[in-house]
């Protein structure tokens, strides 16, 4: 088996930054997208980490802004025949797995995810084969092929509850791909978890020294942290949770100032939820010339207005998501297990 992904040494195929549009160009593409959505019987679903103007457009056109699973779930229930998925590639794949009868379009199929890239299916299969006694649980941020190998798919919003459940059944776990989220879940549940060593390029950049300095500057601020962050950052948090859970925490915490350690794309919906509170970005390591993500996923940034318009207008191999049917059927099994489990929690 080849060496597993190491976020400290990996070379990411970062995309070029999109060319900024003028005000007139933005207005032109916004109107064009609205028209094309109607003509195509399409609905737009956008992730919390996309740029604010993309989230705003999804709102204005009756679409959805949420985490990756809710995006796919919304799309499956919506009567539209076409889903425009503004996010990264695995999100489009998940939408296709749950809605095979629908046309799934993305602004670009080149929008990757460091967690997905960091868990190649060949290496992961070998890893699982080496530990056949373990139940395989994979994060939503994985390819359809990796999901197809799993017993369960999970999102950060129900990860603790699911592992608690599996641990109560005496099951030992393989967790992939995010090592930080895996360790957080392990600490919360005490489960027997063997972690794959992947990491999110955005959350892995948050460092304690810079966050401590910001905390000293704003001692009245609460710290909100996504569990994909390193353990030392999680330990500093007043609230830890998924994107939707962090937005909920922003509303319930009494603090008027919040330091947020996740992708800054979340600020659009979080600020809507708490319009009277001040939101501060948690600092990332290597700011300036050596900054890598700077608290914003470079692949999420590929979801621009021009690319969305082109996807709706052109379709084709550059924009339409396809998943092999046999692979889709296998990946659907652990996804449905998760959906059924999540339904019991809501009940």
Swiss-Prot record:
Give me the residues that bind iminosuccinate, please: 47, 68, 139-141, 156, 226-228, 243
According to its UniProt record, where is this protein mainly located? cytoplasm
| Disulfide feature | 291-294
Pfam families for the chain: NadA
Q: In what way is its activity controlled?
A: Activity is greater under oxic conditions and is regulated by the formation of a reversible disulfide-bond between Cys-291 and Cys-294.
Listed GO cellular component terms?
cytosol
List the SUPFAM superfamilies hit by this protein, alphabetically.
Answer: NadA-like
The protein's role, per its UniProt record: Catalyzes the condensation of iminoaspartate with dihydroxyacetone phosphate to form quinolinate.
Identification of the protein by name: Quinolinate synthase
* UniProt lineage: Bacteria, Pseudomonadati, Pseudomonadota, Gammaproteobacteria, Enterobacterales
């Amino acid at each position: 088996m080849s060496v597993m992904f190491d976020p400290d040494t990996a070379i990411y195929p970062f995309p070029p930054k999109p060319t900024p549009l003028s005000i007139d160009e933005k207005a032109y593409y916004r109107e064009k997208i609205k028209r094309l959505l109607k003509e195509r019987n399409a609905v737009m679903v956008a992730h919390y980490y996309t740029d604010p103007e993309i989230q705003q457009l999804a709102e204005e056109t009756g679409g959805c802004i949420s985490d990756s699973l809710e995006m796919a779930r919304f799309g499956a229930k919506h009567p539209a025949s076409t889903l425009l998925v503004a996010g990264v590639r695995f999100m489009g794949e998940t939408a296709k797995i749950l809605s095979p009868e629908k046309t799934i379009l993305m602004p670009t199929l080149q929008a990757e995810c460091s967690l997905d890239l960091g868990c190649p299916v060949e290496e992961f299969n070998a890893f699982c084969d080496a530990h056949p006694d373990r139940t395989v649980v994979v994060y939503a941020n994985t390819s359809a092929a990796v999901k197809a190998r799993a017993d369960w798919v999970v999102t950060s919003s129900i990860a603790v509850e699911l592992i608690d459940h599996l641990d109560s059944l005496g099951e030992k776990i393989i967790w992939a791909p995010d090592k930080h989220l895996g360790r957080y879940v392990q600490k919360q549940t005490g489960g027997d978890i063997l972690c794959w060593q992947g990491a999110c390029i955005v959350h892995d950049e948050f460092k304690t020294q810079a966050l401590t300095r910001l905390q000293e500057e704003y001692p009245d601020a609460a710290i909100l942290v996504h569990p994909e962050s390193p353990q030392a950052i999680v330990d500093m948090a007043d609230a830890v949770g998924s994107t939707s859970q962090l937005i909920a925490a922003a509303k319930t915490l009494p603090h008027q100032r919040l330091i947020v350690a996740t992708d800054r794309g979340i600020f659009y919906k979080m600020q809507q939820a708490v319009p009277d509170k001040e939101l501060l970005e948690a600092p990332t390591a290597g700011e300036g010339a050596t900054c890598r993500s700077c608290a914003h996923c470079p692949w999420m940034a590929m979801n621009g207005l021009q690319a969305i318009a082109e996807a709706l207008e052109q379709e084709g191999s550059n924009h339409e998501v396809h998943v092999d049917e046999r692979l889709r059927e296998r990946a659907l099994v652990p996804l449905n297990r998760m959906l059924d489990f999540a339904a019991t929690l809501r009940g």
